[in-house]
Amino acid sequence: MSLRIYNTLSRALEEFSPLEPGHVRMYVCGMTIYDLCHIGHARMMMAFDVVQRWLKARGLKVTYVRNITDIDDKIIGRALERGITIGALTDEMIAAMHADIGALGLEPPTLEPRATQYVPRMLALIGQLQAKGLAYRASNGDVNYAVRKFQGYGKLSGKSPDELRAGARVALADGKTDPLDFVLWKSAKPHEPPEAQWDSDYGRGRPGWHIECSAMSCATLGESFDIHGGGADLQFPHHENEIAQSEGVTGKPLARFWLHNGFVRVDNEKMSKSLGNFFTIRDVLAQYDAQTVRFFIVRAHYRSALNYSDAHLDDARQALKRLYTALSLVPPAPVAAIDWTEPHAARFQAAMDEDFGTPEAVAVLFDLAVEVNKSHSPQRAGLLKALGGCLGLLQGDPRAFLQAGAGTPDEADIQARIAARAAAKAQRDFAEADRIRNALLAQGIVLKDGATGTTWEAAQ
């Protein structure tokens, strides 16, 4: 059976085959690292973690690139606000991001380029766009992209420039000749530190956000590649602008397939700090183990909206316990390679081959768990574990998971909560720090603060 993927560009399911037989090249827009990663970032990273895992399960080589934006208005603002260098802030946030990724059990991307490493390539692209008449120097010193000069603008969002302009709110006082035009190179501002500036033919300045991804994707994957992914919020204008930049230079399709994961809402409301419903990955892992968080995310289809709530996480935990309970009954037999002709495996494959249909694939896991409960077959248990592994699930020790659910957190859970408590203390949120300490104490874990950090031990 062939793999079909929903392509945002065509707004249809299309049969997928890589440009280079046997090798998939995929680029996903990563984090702008001025703060800790939140549950929306976790959803995006988890979605493409599953995509990567499934492509590999089908025997394909995957070169997965997820970039890091380490220069941006928000990064500059946060560094100035905290009185530290941009480098100190980004190094801190990258380390925190990697810790969160590790705690979630995500497979790392093949490459993780940082925007500041590719500024010369960005300037080269801007020069090529200017030579083709697609970019112009503005009165304020910026270099902007002339949107109406690119014939294909709007094809990803499905709207013409006139339709898009009707909703544009950009004033022309910023040197743009059209509200839809966007900045490729930002001239240096008096308040910006020297480390946020590079020399160029246009004077000191820095790249715009959109040109960063065009440069990094081309440098790491080539002028055309198989899959470009990201959150639904990036479809317009970020991904639309990437297409205009890259295809404006090369004349070739930037990516054959465009994939966008759905939004995360919190108790059916948009997640925002002002509403008090903003949750970092560390906040979530302070309450729930990583396997529960993964199960909560992957049992929903990646394109659907995901509603975060304690009730839904609690339900995910109970559902996952059913799968681990089956695996605790009998040691799973090792599976060297999944036999995709086996009926359960065939159903699982059919589900995943239809636009990474994780809800239907998870349903197969539960059907298989019922069989394990009845038969106590090591072979059935082995298949359950192997299929779960395609989603990054069921690879932990079943008894440890079930015992942790009974009230004793495991090592990874404890360390995640310690990290969340440290972050709360750093932000002087001592009430939250105390809440985490007391929650662990209620589960029989005592935290001890020392000169070298926080350690823990079981309560006597």
Curated annotation (Swiss-Prot):
It is found in: Cytoplasm. A motif ('KMSKS' region) lies at residues 270-274. Binds 1 zinc ion per subunit. Its EC number is 6.1.1.16. ATP binds at K273. It is an enzyme of class 6 (ligase). A motif ('HIGH' region) lies at residues 31-41. CDD domains: CysRS_core. The gene is cysS. It comes from Verminephrobacter eiseniae (strain EF01-2). GO terms for molecular function: ATP binding; cysteine-tRNA ligase activity; zinc ion binding. Monomer. One of its GO terms (cellular component) is cytosol. NCBIfam families: cysS. The keyword NAD does not apply. Keywords: Aminoacyl-tRNA synthetase, ATP-binding, Cytoplasm, Ligase, Metal-binding, Nucleotide-binding, Protein biosynthesis, Zinc. It holds the Pfam family tRNA-synt_1e. GO terms for biological process: cysteinyl-tRNA aminoacylation. InterPro entries: Cys-tRNA-ligase, Cys-tRNA-synt_Ia_DALR, Cys-tRNA/MSH_ligase, Rossmann-like_a/b/a_fold, tRNA-synt_1_cat_dom, tRNAsynth_Ia_anticodon-bd. The keyword ATP-binding applies. This is Cysteine--tRNA ligase. Its main location: cytoplasm. It catalyses: tRNA(Cys) + L-cysteine + ATP = L-cysteinyl-tRNA(Cys) + AMP + diphosphate. It comes from the Bacteria. Its cofactor is Zn(2+). Zn(2+) binds at C29, C213, H238, E242.
